[in-house]
């Protein structure tokens, strides 16, 4: 009975986006998913605005009405981001034999996705230099220590 009264008091509200889940006042009456989506949009918006500002040089700072920058620049950068997402989703085939790999694809350090038969570097003519990468990793992990040039330091 007390639980029904708490329900009717209005502490539980449906999400403001009408997705069917409950929102809370701490998340602006949004459910957790809608709130995360909104936070993601707000965090990427300054990046797009900054990219638009850097892409449009200010030729005449005294006359802001004669801007040569297109107003649709943020949508074009969003379209470029869509191209990147499409390229990532396109890697569902083996780079050597074009066989569908689905979820079992093996990503190589050369950047390709391969099936079980071509997953090893020797099998798909990998262009990645594993020896140089290993040398660089060892050089970063173990910096060269040089001794003092003056032997009789006071």
UniProtKB/Swiss-Prot annotation:
Induction remark: By dehydration and salt stress.
Functional description taken from the UniProt entry: May be involved in environmental stress response.
Residues noted as binding Zn(2+) 1 in the record, renumbered to the chain: 15, 19, 31, 34
Species assigned in the record: Oryza sativa subsp. japonica (Rice)
Binding site for Zn(2+) 2: 94, 97, 115, 118
Signal peptide (from-to): none
Binding residue positions for Zn(2+) 3: 108, 110, 124, 126
Zinc finger (AN1-type) residue numbers: 88-134
Keywords linked to the UniProt accession: Metal-binding, Stress response, Zinc, Zinc-finger
Record bears the keyword DNA-binding: no
Entry annotated with the keyword Zinc-finger: yes
SMART domains: ZnF_A20, ZnF_AN1
GO molecular function: DNA binding; zinc ion binding
Record gene name: SAP5
Protein name: Zinc finger A20 and AN1 domain-containing stress-associated protein 5
A20-type zinc-finger residues: 9-43
Pfam families: zf-A20, zf-AN1
């Amino acid at each position: 009975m007390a639980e029904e009264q708490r329900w009717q008091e209005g502490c539980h509200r449906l999400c403001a986006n009408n997705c069917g889940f409950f929102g809370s006042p701490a998340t602006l009456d949004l459910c957790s998913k809608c709130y995360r989506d909104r936070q993601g949009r707000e965090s990427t918006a300054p990046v797009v605005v900054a990219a638009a500002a850097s892409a449009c040089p200010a030729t005449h700072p005294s006359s802001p009405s004669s801007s040569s920058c297109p107003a649709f620049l943020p949508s074009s950068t969003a379209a470029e981001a869509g191209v990147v997402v499409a390229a990532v989703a396109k890697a569902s085939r083996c780079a050597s034999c074009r066989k569908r790999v689905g979820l079992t694809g093996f990503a190589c350090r050369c950047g390709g996705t391969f099936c079980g038969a071509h997953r090893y570097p020797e099998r798909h003519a990998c262009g990645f230099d594993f020896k140089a990468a290993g040398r660089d990793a060892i050089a970063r992990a173990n910096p060269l220590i040089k001794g003092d040039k003056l032997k009789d330091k006071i």
